[in-house]
């Protein structure tokens, strides 16, 4: 990563008034942080070692865990949802593959009035507020990944969070990863939009079990993607093979575009994305607390074309 490119990326953040950090490749597996502050309020500064709600960037964590269970032959892409949740309407017609690529036909857009406490409450809420459209076309729904998280838990006889800690956080020494319930507002950059309350943030993250309940620092998220995703070419190849059969090339938590994988995360007050070349391991991430989803999408596209050269 040369100085000139770093300057260009910083200029991009500055000219678009993005309060946040970008992470790009440094030496080896390490990341270089590019920071732009649009505020002097320390409570609102985004930092590479400060917790940040992962939102949908968590889906690839869940997808990776599912892949590893598939490798151990504990489940397969064709395994029926009925195996784990026979009480769900139409579960016999839904496979793990369809949960991984958002073609399950399941929908759930409800949010609780109060944050859900613990995995049991999260699963109960999910099951009560779910409906089945019985169509197997692309529909980006968090509930697919909430179910995958619940399946992981049933399969390994541990809570989802405990399993993620044992499987990824411990071996990779990720010390900045917490469930929403363990996080205080002080530990997270507060949204720059005063209309967004901490209550909104906790309600959203608590009901995105497996698809946004975890907070991670940008550095820890980089470490996870670099080691567990980009470091596993067998998995990315398998995900690509699965994704390219679909109307939308998506599988396991990421979109595919040739050798590029990418994902966006968005909850009230927080937006983030990553784009990586899974062959060369070139990668860029963006975490911000003052832009909306449309600005995030535009920034992600700009990075894809101007930085990743895709």
Task: Give the label of every model feature segment.
Residues 41-42, 203:
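A short small-residue
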């Amino acid at each position: 990563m040369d100085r000139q490119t770093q300057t260009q990326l910083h200029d991009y953040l500055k000219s678009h008034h993005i309060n946040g950090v970008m992470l790009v490749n440094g030496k080896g597996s390490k990341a270089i942080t590019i920071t732009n502050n649009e505020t002097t309020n320390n409570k609102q500064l985004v930092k590479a070692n400060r917790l940040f709600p992962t939102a949908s960037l968590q889906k690839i964590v869940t997808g990776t865990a599912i892949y590893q269970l598939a490798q151990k032959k504990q489940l397969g892409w064709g395994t029926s949802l009925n195996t784990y949740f026979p009480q769900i309407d139409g579960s016999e017609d839904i496979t793990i593959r369809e949960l991984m690529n958002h073609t399950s036909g399941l929908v759930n857009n409800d949010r609780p009035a109060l944050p859900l406490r613990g995995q049991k409450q999260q699963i109960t809420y999910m099951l009560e507020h779910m409906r089945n459209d019985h169509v197997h076309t692309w529909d980006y729904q968090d509930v697919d990944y909430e179910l995958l998280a619940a399946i992981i838990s049933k399969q390994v006889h541990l809570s989802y969070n405990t399993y993620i800690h044992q499987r990824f956080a411990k071996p990779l020494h990720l010390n900045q990863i917490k469930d929403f319930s363990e996080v205080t507002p002080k530990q997270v950059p507060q949204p720059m939009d005063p209309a967004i309350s901490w209550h909104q943030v906790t309600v959203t993250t608590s009901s995105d079990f497996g698809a946004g309940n975890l907070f991670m620092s940008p550095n820890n998220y980089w470490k996870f993607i670099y080691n567990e995703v980009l470091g596993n070419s067998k998995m990315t190849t398998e995900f690509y093979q699965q994704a390219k059969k679909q109307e939308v090339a998506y599988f396991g938590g990421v979109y595919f575009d040739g050798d590029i994988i990418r994902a966006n995360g968005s909850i009230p007050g927080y937006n983030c994305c990553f784009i990586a070349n899974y062959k060369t391991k070139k990668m860029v991430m963006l975490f911000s607390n003052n832009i909306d989803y449309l600005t995030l999408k535009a920034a992600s596209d700009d990075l894809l074309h101007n930085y990743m050269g895709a």
